[in-house]
Amino acid sequence: PTINITNYDEYIYISNASFSDKPIAGFDLDYTLIKPKSGKLFAKNKDDWRFLFDNVVSYLQSIAPTYNIVIFTNQNGIKKDAKREMFLAKIVQIIEAIQLPIHIYASKTNGFMRKPLTGLWETCLSNIKSKHTNHFYCGDAAGRPDDFAATDLMFANNNNITFLLPEEVFKEEKSDIEYSWPEYLTQYSGSSAKLTFEVEGPTLLLMCGYPGCGKSTVVNTLDGFTAVSNDTLGTKAKCIKATKELMLKNINIVVDNTNLSLANRIEYYKLAREWIVSKKGNPYNIIVIHINNNIQFCYYMNQLRCQLSKGVQKLVPKIAYHTLKKRAEFPALSEYDNIKIITHSSMVDEYIYQFPPL
């Protein structure tokens, strides 16, 4: 059969057949169905692979009449042409070796189409248009002591499907794998307390915290404040300009940015000081609201935003978090005269989706 390859923006779809009206038998690729035959951690060329177990093909043959066989694999490196060509050449070899109807979804970006987010699975389901529910998914990344991650277990759980380890499927070994919610999340379980504070005269409110900490959620609960944000205006310079213009109206302003560096906050303190010197209106009070959830919680919420918006809300990349953490200067009373600092933690009623740590 002809092998069809379609290269989408965020993933590649490869198949040699149409979908049938059957449930899905889902598999990860590396260290679930195959491994490098060189013994190295990563394949060095398109020929550097072998089946993980001797019975992989015979097992797939045994389930093919009952299931659509689908591979879901994260392949971040295949954005580059050379890596993509090597990967596709290897996939063609694997399909030819298996000699069965097969479908492969290979994620090539970070975001909704990358496991454990559910984009690949949802795309597959939409292609089948089937009402079957007895799917399963098999993968090696399950959070065991020697596993590099728990991505596959999370992917199955996020899609509410049965999870199996390769050893369970191909060697019939029994296992009992469960996901344990990490303490960096469970410490924020519960209902969020409503943030209340008194405002006397015109007030400039600076939000402070990592992306995903819940700054905008707090801002949306504030009455009588006009928001200024990089997300809507695009640059810091435009935020400063907009704040200056709003101060001319003597109204309450909230700056909904990370504001994690002292230098950034000082720019707004300067506006308030210039305001006092110019005597254009009542002096602006400054309140800094520091959302102090740990960075792992914030990265989790960043992934959750991407998941719930089905990729419309783009992921803030890991490197941005690491850079912010390295440079973060949390607010202190000594920064400015008559400053008020409020610390607040965002809370979550219930965790449903599972995502990897930073």
Region locations from a protein language model:
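Conserved substrate/cofactor phosphate-moiety recognition/catalytic segment
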Residues: 217-266
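Acidic, metal-coordinating catalytic cores used for nucleic-acid/nucleotide bond scission
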Residues: 76-83, 110-113, 143-145, 256-268
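Active-site neighborhood of HAD-like aspartate-dependent phosphohydrolases
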Residues: 2-69
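Conserved GTP-binding G-domain of TRAFAC-class P-loop NTPases and closely related GTPase folds
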Residues: 113-127, 133-171, 175-184, 221, ...
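Non-catalytic pre-domain segments flanking phosphatase-related domains
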Residues: 1-27, 129, 150, 169-203
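Glycine-rich phosphate-binding P-loop
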Residues: 204-223
